[in-house]
Swiss-Prot record:
Gene Ontology BP, a term: response to oxidative stress
Name of this chain's protein: Peroxiredoxin
Binding site for substrate: 122
Description of how the protein assembles with itself and partners: Homodecamer. Pentamer of dimers that assemble into a ring structure.
Active site positions, chain numbering: 46 (cysteine sulfenic acid (-soh) intermediate)
HAMAP family: Peroxiredoxin
Enzyme class, spelled out: oxidoreductase
Miscellaneous notes: The active site is a conserved redox-active cysteine residue, the peroxidatic cysteine (C(P)), which makes the nucleophilic attack on the peroxide substrate. The peroxide oxidizes the C(P)-SH to cysteine sulfenic acid (C(P)-SOH), which then reacts with another cysteine residue, the resolving cysteine (C(R)), to form a disulfide bridge. The disulfide is subsequently reduced by an appropriate electron donor to complete the catalytic cycle.
Naturally occurring in which organism (per UniProt): Methanococcus vannielii (strain ATCC 35089 / DSM 1224 / JCM 13029 / OCM 148 / SB)
Highest taxon in the source lineage: Archaea
Subcellular location: Cytoplasm
Membrane-traversing stretches: none
Amino acid sequence: MAVIGEKFPDVELLTTHGKLKLPEHFIEAGKWFVLFSHPGDFTPVCTTEFVAFQKRYDQFRELNTELIGLSIDQVFSHIKWVEWIKEKLDVDIEFPIIADERGDLAVKLGMISPFKGSNTVRAVFVVDATGTIRAIIYYPQEVGRNMDEVVRLVKALQTADKGYATPADWPNNELLKEKVIIPPAKDMKTRAERLEACKRGDISGYDWWFCYTNLKE
């Protein structure tokens, strides 16, 4: 079962856009990707999710991030489902969908729960441009995902790469609003420097271990 911080496994997969090597394809392109599994094609909750992901596709692309769907259905089922969504809902699904028919990748990533049947649960894997798994979320089959949270998660992870942490509900935190947290000082010298920076107004803080600032682009 995959965990945060490890490399995404090297696999070659069949998708609605042809064969795809992960994470190699996106490492070479210098892109992040969000891999999300769904229980099955031609199901109501999954259909609403795919429409929602597609409507936010431009937001993900602005974050240098691509989308990939996955289920254990055949690629022919994926293709017909995408056609149905276009015909009935007038939404063109532009991202690829993996046909993991034998469930090899789904099992490797822990997307199938023995307590929830043989289909994949609603998993979300955020993988950065080095092929490292940065975040994992699991939802049960009966609960649709919050797409705004997935977008927020990618933004927060990319913000963390700039040396900051993000507070609860960022960028709408009750205490800090859109500001970001400076990681706590780990030695006395840095502690003193933080306190001085707060006095000068260079940064803000409640104490030496709880300092925050505006996000610098």
